[in-house]
Amino acid sequence: IYGHTISPHVGGGTNSSEYEMLSSNSLMLMPSITPFNWLNLHKANSLVSNLKDLGYATLAAHPYTNSNYRRDSAWLTLGFDETHFQNDFPTKETYGSRPYQTDSATYRDLEGLYEAMPEDQPRFVFLVSIQSHGDYDMNPPEEDIVHAATDYGEYDSIMDEYLSNIYMTDRAFGELTEYLTEQYEKTGRKVIVAMAGDHAPSFVDHVADHTFTDENNLQILERSTPYLIWANYPLENAGQTSATDEYNRMDMCMLAPTLVENAGLPLTPYYQYLLALKQVAPVVTAANDYMDADGVTHTYGENAELDAWVHGYFNLEYNNIGAKATRQQNLFQVEK
């Protein structure tokens, strides 16, 4: 299953995408914050808490410093059983002059962390990779693997380095899927993987075709990043990619419910509402607009029926992140 998710930002703000992905809470209600630095995550509802309620062992990892966005404390507060950072990734491998761990090396080290998790529990692993982090002018041209076919003028060399990183990410993901397929053949353990880009590069507006569509559509397209859901066993909805189907373009907040649904796990009422919302308004942005199921963008106040759906979501979100004493917790956890 593959398509595009819509990131809250362009050119940065990984933590915003990370928060929306884990919590399914849109930053539309809090557009100017860095979630892990500003929000009280104690007893926060998230994909982590939902899976722990189902008996999962949980692990979060990032092959870089633990201080970025306070991940060292934020992940533990969210409920991850264990967290791992650069010292737990011993395979030091970089691409050319770039200082960041390659995805291939990251996945190889992650395999060891994954295999060390409890064998008697299902496992949830959350990884934030680092290979394709900006900037994209670190390597000499001879290090580029991919060269853009389109002339981007002064952005040619930057585009080449960026696309070379994407190419390497693609190959590394292939290595990971081969490993997980072999694991299934050896152990019978089923694994489903969701992979998504955190945000488009900062130069995207400089290389975008501004004649292609209006500014409302363009800003959504510029914040679109690829996602895929893959499993080492047959997925019922595999191959859904048409321009208007529900899997083609969706908000980052809807990725976790979509993953949980395709994994065949119980859905919280919050996730159920988001999946229903996805049928009518699959994109609810951190800007002042949203996209309907036909790919048409709207600003709030244009369509009363769609507004009601979106406002219903925001009411649920407000209850979720507001005062915990008045939160209707049954809406945000699986029924036991």
Language model features with spans:
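Solvent-exposed soluble domains appended to multi-pass membrane proteins
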Residues: 1-336
